[in-house]
Curated annotation (Swiss-Prot):
Gene3D superfamilies: 3.30.300.20, Ribosomal protein S3, C-terminal domain. Belongs to the universal ribosomal protein uS3 family. InterPro entries: KH_dom, KH_dom-like_a/b, KH_dom_type_2, KH_sf_prok-type, Ribosomal_S3_C_sf, Ribosomal_uS3_bac-typ, Ribosomal_uS3_C, Ribosomal_uS3_CS. Binds the lower part of the 30S subunit head. Binds mRNA in the 70S ribosome, positioning it for translation. Residues 39-108 form the KH type-2 domain. This is Small ribosomal subunit protein uS3. It comes from the Bacteria. Keywords: Ribonucleoprotein, Ribosomal protein, RNA-binding, rRNA-binding. The gene is rpsC. GO terms for biological process: translation. GO terms for molecular function: mRNA binding; rRNA binding; structural constituent of ribosome. The lineage of its organism: Bacteria, Pseudomonadati, Aquificota, Aquificia, Aquificales.
Length: 227
């Protein structure tokens, strides 16, 4: 029986980077991890209309840097940066960190961001758009924006049927077993009249590694397939 691997975790340190970067002593690790979870949850809920793609957190001693990637950064920044200043103070209270720096960057192509695409599909499902139409629209938009491949999946009581099921659509290539493949993965949930629907999106943007790094990775992949 085949085993599923998380697309992001599978490529950490190769084509994907860590969302949290810090070191903590064993006795403080759990507290620090829960602080990161609280920060992300707060930002995603407070700025839901901004289209939050990711929240990157770096810590060094008593300093913390939070980088927010958003489709509509103006909502997070606020008038003359007022909202960012508020967010700084809130994060300090949530974590007891002395110095917090918040940076907000714009997602240039939301159509190629798996999390934003998944959330857009979820929003359409909540507005009673059919799942096939929502998924096909997302696929068309991603391919027009330059995606090499895209796969979308919806699971749950689709259309209000008694038994839960999964439906998916795919266009282009999706090399899930290739480590050098730059595959963005995102999920979302849609609250419908018949219950919760889960949405998953994979977007293949091409290969990232070149030259010697690619040769080394190819040898590693060959060894993995032969063992």
């Amino acid at each position: 029986m085949g085993q599923k691997v998380h697309p992001t975790g599978f490529r950490l340190g190769i084509t994907q980077d860590w969302k949290s970067k810090w070191y903590s002593e064993k006795k403080k690790y759990t507290q620090t991890l829960h602080e990161d979870i609280k920060i992300r949850k707060f930002i995603e809920e407070r700025y839901k209309q901004a289209g939050i793609s990711s929240v990157l957190i770096e810590r060094l001693g008593d300093r913390m840097r939070v980088k927010i990637m958003a489709a509509r950064p103006g909502i997070v920044i606020g008038a003359k940066g007022a909202e960012v200043e508020k967010l700084n103070e809130i994060i300090k209270k949530l974590t007891s960190t002395k110095e917090v720096i918040v940076n907000v960057d714009e997602v240039k192509k939301p159509e190629l961001d798996a999390k934003l695409v998944a959330e857009d599909i979820a929003l359409q499902l909540e507005r009673r758009v059919t799942h096939r139409r929502a998924m096909k629209k997302a696929i068309d938009s991603a391919l027009k924006a330059g995606a090499k491949g895209i796969k979308t999946q919806v699971g749950g009581r689709i259309g209000g049927v008694d038994l839960a099921r999964k439906e998916w659509f795919m266009a282009g290539r999706m090399p899930l077993q290739t480590l050098k493949a730059d595959i963005d993965y995102g999920t979302a949930r849609a609250s419908t009249k018949y219950g919760i629907l889960g949405i998953k999106v994979w977007i293949y943007k091409g290969d990232k590694l070149e030259g010697k790094a690619e040769e080394v990775l190819s040898r590693v992949e060959e060894e993995l397939h032969t063992t």
